[in-house]
């Protein structure tokens, strides 16, 4: 089904930045750090947010959406991908605030792997797991680990390279980002594309991003305020990651009792 592609006919890798209008306060810090730690970035940036627009000097930011209130994370991304002309993309979330220079050499190598191997659908650009029998070191692509078919979270919203048509195939319009990772990983088992993850990070940012369920992670956010001069949003709640995770665990137990949860759960398995 798949074969080698001619690298001379390849498309570029624009950045798709997944966000939402209520997180617009994250954009200026994100782009400031992007310019600082990835100054070579000169490709288009597609900002996936419901209605708002953003400008940052020196960056080509496109915000094409005008989504209705209540649209889901996946609905927004599905719609945005219709505007992306390129066949490949770099995907990031708005709270992945960079803390160190991007590993350009490794990024370009991963891009070349995807360009020239049509069965490579996703390469996660931050380490996620250690090599194992289920997730072996790739002999074909040294420095990469190949996700096993049964590995949980072989589809993730961590920073990564995507083949656009693969991403479009996995997305279901009713899902949140968290459900996309959970159930998209299961759907991906039935698809022919392979997924990989780097052993050495291309991007360096705090684990999971500077937010947790919409709240600043205090140990992360304060670092940026002190070391990068980032002005944090006064109205955005802040808490330790441990506290925020515990609250989410307790809330999640209640959510699973709601009929809507059961309905959406079934939809993700169809």
Task: Show where each model-derived region lies.
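A structural signal for short, well-ordered beta-strand segments and their strand-loop junctions
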Residues: 46-47, 89-91, 121-126, 161, ...
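Short, flexible, basic/aromatic active-site loop/helix in glycosyltransferases
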Residues: 136-152
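N-terminal anchoring/stem segment of glycosyltransferases
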Residues: 1-69, 81-88
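Conserved donor-nucleotide/metal-binding helix-loop-beta segment in metal-dependent transferases, i.e.
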Residues: 101-130
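Catalytic core and acceptor-binding pocket of nucleotide-sugar-dependent glycosyltransferases
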Residues: 154-219
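Short beta-strand-to-loop acidic/aromatic patch adjacent to the donor-nucleotide binding site
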Residues: 87-97
